[in-house]
């Protein structure tokens, strides 16, 4: 099955990678430069089932709310406040998305405006998922079913239009909250990046389109650009 990384387009990928590397306590590494790209992408590999993050150079401006955002977990109220204080010290800002005062999570934006939440302690859904507990996405049930099959990750939640999947080894959950969705806006500044198993990109494209993806184009870096059943672009690398 393909390996999943979450890619962020960024005006300053090195700075954004430093923010997330420090917040997540990870070691950044430079990706090899693809053809036509002059600024390096930076990868924050995940371990023990935690999603990896990739930051790629782009001049595209952020428009509206992202269709996916990260959830960081907390072990106590004090731990939640420490995470928030650390994030603010690194350049994050508080964000009002209409959350109610009685809700325990804290909504922040990273230095390029990407939303993320620091979840309150005692959240049973994210118990045992690790510090990067969840990637929360917009999307109907068919999107979750597609990604479950595409990644070989079983459904761990399937209620109404809400779905969630998790690697068989545990770790970060990927969840879709059902409608209403935020509008799909191109170009897609956040996306799933997949690495084809064994480097066989052509065979993997065939498998993914057979599951319901749509072929879009070949990118300049040699990756295949596809669209999932929810209209979200993703890339498949060799």
Predicted regions and their residues:
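Glyoxalase I/VOC metalloenzyme domain signal
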Residues: 1-33, 37-39, 43-96, 109-160, ...
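Short, small/polar residue-rich loop motifs at catalytic or cofactor-binding pockets
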Residues: 101-103, 219-221
């Amino acid at each position: 099955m393909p390996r999943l990384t979450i890619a962020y387009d960024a005006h300053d990928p090195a700075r954004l990678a430093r923010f997330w590397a420090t917040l997540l306590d990870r070691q950044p590494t430079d990706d090899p430069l693809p053809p036509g790209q002059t600024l390096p992408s930076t990868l924050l590999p995940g371990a023990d089932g935690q999603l990896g993050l990739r930051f790629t150079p782009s001049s595209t401006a952020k428009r509206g709310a992202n269709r996916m955002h990260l959830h960081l977990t907390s072990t106590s109220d004090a731990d939640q406040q420490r995470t928030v204080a650390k994030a603010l010290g690194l350049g994050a800002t508080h964000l009002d998305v209409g959350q109610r005062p009685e809700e325990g999570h804290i909504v922040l934006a990273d230095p390029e405006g990407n939303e993320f939440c620091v979840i309150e302690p005692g959240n049973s859904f994210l118990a045992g998922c690790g510090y990067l507990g969840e990637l929360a996405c917009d999307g109907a049930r068919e999107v979750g079913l597609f990604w479950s099959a595409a990644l070989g990750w079983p459904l761990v939640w399937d209620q109404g239009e809400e779905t969630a999947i998790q690697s068989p080894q545990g770790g970060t959950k990927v969840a879709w909250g059902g409608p209403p969705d935020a509008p799909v806006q191109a170009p897609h500044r956040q996306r799933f990046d997949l690495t084809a198993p064994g480097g066989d990109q052509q065979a993997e494209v065939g498998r993914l389109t057979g599951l319901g993806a749509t072929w879009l184009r070949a990118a300049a870096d040699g990756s295949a650009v596809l669209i999932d059943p929810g209209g979200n672009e993703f890339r498949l690398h060799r």
